[in-house]
């Protein structure tokens, strides 16, 4: 079976791009003929490892769909998008399945090809008609399923997977809380909120030996640094850049704290859980509630309830036995629901291969 996976720009090293590469490698390992189509190429190489058999193709002369020039924007939203669909039909007549992870849609199709779309963001009403062009729409979490099904019939839930589940577990006696993510200008991960929560916790002497490690880069990093200084938390909060040796960071932590306002899925929660780390998150629209079992593997807190979040975090910090119990269940959930073998069986069923 010949499969094509698309990406906006496979070279930028984002979360979606990593998912595309992981899925491509998994299909290749199952014996499929796999190709990735990237519409853009900001950097010279893809930052993620691809198996040697996988073909990487860049779409010829793709225009910048994010241009601010009004006439170009109008052209890109109308004529050019149809041109891309027509060109793809010509280029990929031999594909049995095309799995979209991009802004483009299959306005023109080949009869022998099935078309799928993985939605890495929340439901967009403006895309309802265009999403009906796909044979199946794949969403990552259950929380939005009812909304999707009220608008579109062809919807499936297939989560992301971890390529490997580590044998090692963290030592949960370490007094470190960890949070990882891109530090964007609009603070989507709400690191500043986490800093404010941390300030309230540090008022109590029994928690002053604990450290908060924030790992990430981005335009919003300076604002986070300023907030830490303004609240005089330099001694208990450490900012670190992104690292390829992220395993060391997980193995140095006893709690993972997420405060995001939105998540496509929340791969960091999976990764932390795979090391036996109990996780905390606000119960936002998508993501965390599929990974965290509240009061069993971690805590889910009503969105924006900072007081309760702080109280639950203090409870975990205070009780190592609770951390051990939550961490054990967290790892079990990853094995049961998010291993590569489990998720690829779902893909094979969708593709009528099993």
Name every feature range the model reports, one short phrase each.
Residues 5-13, 26-75, 218-220:
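N-terminal strand-loop element at the rim of the active site
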Residues 261:
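Aromatic "clamp/platform" in nucleotide-sugar-dependent glycosyltransferases that forms part
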Residues 293-295, 299-307, 315-321:
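Conserved acidic donor-binding segment of nucleotide-sugar-dependent glycosyltransferases
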Residues 308, 315, 322-349:
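A short, well-ordered alpha-helix in the C-terminal region of glycosyltransferases
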